[in-house]
């Protein structure tokens, strides 16, 4: 669920700098379609805004290739994981059409887009210092990625209307926590004004 009431939690305001920002589109895959569908248009709008502002875009794809990469997720979710090569592992078609090349895809097998991936090297190579986070699930992979980005020294912008999870309570709890200590909250309108109005 996405929410506009997140402005209640906003403690700091800032706009992303398109010269040093990247957009991270987290796990917009068939497995999560029921959660992703309500925010699909906002996700597409955010991608379009960032492309028009010349902001690089990266798309994560969560999947497991073998039992050796299940880690704690296998225990926690009783083996109900996204397996590589299945329809569930594929990026939602509308989002997949926005991918311009294989270098934009980040394969991951944990909640974090940074853990055991090449994401940080990709970002460092092109001088990225800020990340904008959208996708699913707000309170798991999006939040973990945002927190880890902050700890790694990236300025974090977290979308309130292009992230979603299983219910409003969990979505709002993440927004409250991130606004308090980790991320600037943004939405499509703010990004459009901040990135395209100049």
Curated annotation (Swiss-Prot):
Hydrolase recorded as keyword: yes
Listed pathway(s): Cofactor biosynthesis; nicotinate biosynthesis; nicotinate from nicotinamide: step 1/1
Family matches, as InterPro entries: Isochorismatase-like_dom, Isochorismatase-like_hydrls, Isochorismatase-like_sf
Alphabetical list of Pfam families matching this protein: Isochorismatase
Keywords: Hydrolase, Pyridine nucleotide biosynthesis
One GO BP annotation of this record: pyridine nucleotide biosynthetic process
EC numbers, comma separated: 3.5.1.19
GO function terms (MF aspect): nicotinamidase activity
Family membership: Belongs to the isochorismatase family.
Protein role: Catalyzes the deamidation of nicotinamide, an early step in the NAD(+) salvage pathway. Prevents the accumulation of intracellular nicotinamide, a known inhibitor of poly(ADP-ribose) polymerases (PARP enzymes). May play a role in the regulation of seed germination potential.
Name of this chain's protein: Nicotinamidase 2
Gene that this polypeptide is encoded by: NIC2
């Amino acid at each position: 669920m996405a929410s506009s009431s997140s402005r209640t939690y906003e403690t700091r305001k800032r706009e992303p700098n398109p010269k040093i920002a990247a957009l991270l589109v987290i796990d917009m895959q068939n497995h999560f379609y029921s959660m992703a569908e309500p925010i699909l248009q906002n996700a597409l709008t955010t991608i379009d805004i960032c492309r028009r502002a010349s902001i690089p875009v990266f798309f994560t794809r969560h999947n497991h290739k073998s039992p050796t990469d299940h880690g704690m997720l296998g225990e926690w979710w009783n083996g109900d994981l996204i397996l590589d090569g299945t329809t569930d592992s594929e990026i939602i078609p509308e989002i997949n059409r926005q991918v311009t090349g294989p270098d934009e895809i980040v394969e991951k097998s944990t909640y974090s887009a940074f853990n055991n991936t090449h994401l940080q090297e990709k970002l460092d190579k092109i001088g990225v210092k800020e990340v904008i986070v959208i996708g699913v699930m707000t309170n798991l992979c999006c939040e973990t990625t945002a927190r880890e980005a902050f700890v790694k020294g990236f300025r974090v912008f977290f979308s309130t209307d292009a992230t979603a999870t299983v219910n409003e309570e969990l979505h709002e709890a993440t927004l409250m926590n991130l606004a308090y200590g980790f991320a600037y909250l943004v939405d499509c309108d703010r990004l459009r004004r901040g990135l395209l109005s100049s």
